[in-house]
Amino acid sequence: MDNIMSKLISKSEIEKFNKDGAVFLKNKFDIKWIEKLKKGIERDIKNPSPRFKSHTTKPNVPAYLEDYWTWDIVPEFKEFVYQSPYAEIASELMSAKKINLVMDNWFLREAGSKSSTPFHHDISYFDMEGTMCVLWLPLQETGKDEGVSWVKGSHLWDKLFLRVLFKDGHKVEGKECILNGKKYELPPDIISNKEKYEFLKWDCELGDCVIFDMRTLHGTLSSSIPNKTLSRYTLRVAKEDTKI
């Protein structure tokens, strides 16, 4: 994923990413990529990896599904990783000379699913330091209250929050502690204190995406239940300054 000079991102978009912790990018991905990723998810569901899981605890109800680290076994995902414009976009946003892949995954929330995404930030799930960003690419047209919301500016709080499990109930993993010199705190109760925060959320058409800092808190803000199945593909990538 070596950097290729381009003009995919404007100065204003870079400034928003740095200041807000998330930026909406309009029509950056051709529809062919959306269709390939949807086919990849279908292929993965038929032959899932050992990491495939449902975050829905009740049986026989609409589910919230996920699989990850499958880019090297699902050809559609591998093609996206190597040939889509995301590496260029990410390198421009982070002023990177080189982009390294950290993790790929996808989520699928079936129509009628009551399961949702807890508020969390991705950095806590990885033992890494450096500059990293995440692609959030919806594979269906998604209203701003159907997708994820981001807490504006939360990447600049200089805080690390404990992991939150995606499984229904959203249990916090572990207790407040200092680990390897880093302080991990309980995540804030965003849902019960919405008035304290400013949120970023967007209506997304096919080809639109959101890219956000690994430290930015995000999750499902609305209690609405989707009336259609919604899926999204994500990629986490790191600048050359990142270390494990």
What are these regions (language model features)?
Residues 2-20, 26-119, 125-126:
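Non-heme Fe(II)-dependent double-stranded beta-helix
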Residues 144-217:
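Double-stranded beta-helix
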Residues 47-59, 161-168, 206-211, 215-244:
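Non-heme Fe(II)/2-oxoglutarate
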Residues 113, 117-121, 130, 145-151, ...:
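A short secondary-structure junction signal
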Residues 120-132, 197, 204, 228-230:
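A short beta-loop-beta micro-motif enriched in histidine and acidic residues
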Residues 105, 121, 137-141, 150-152:
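Short, structured patches in soluble enzyme cores that scaffold and shape functional sites
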Residues 86, 96, 111-114, 140-144, ...:
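Short, charged/polar surface micro-motifs in flexible loops or helix N-caps
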Residues 127-143, 236-240:
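Short, conserved beta-strand element in jelly-roll/cupin
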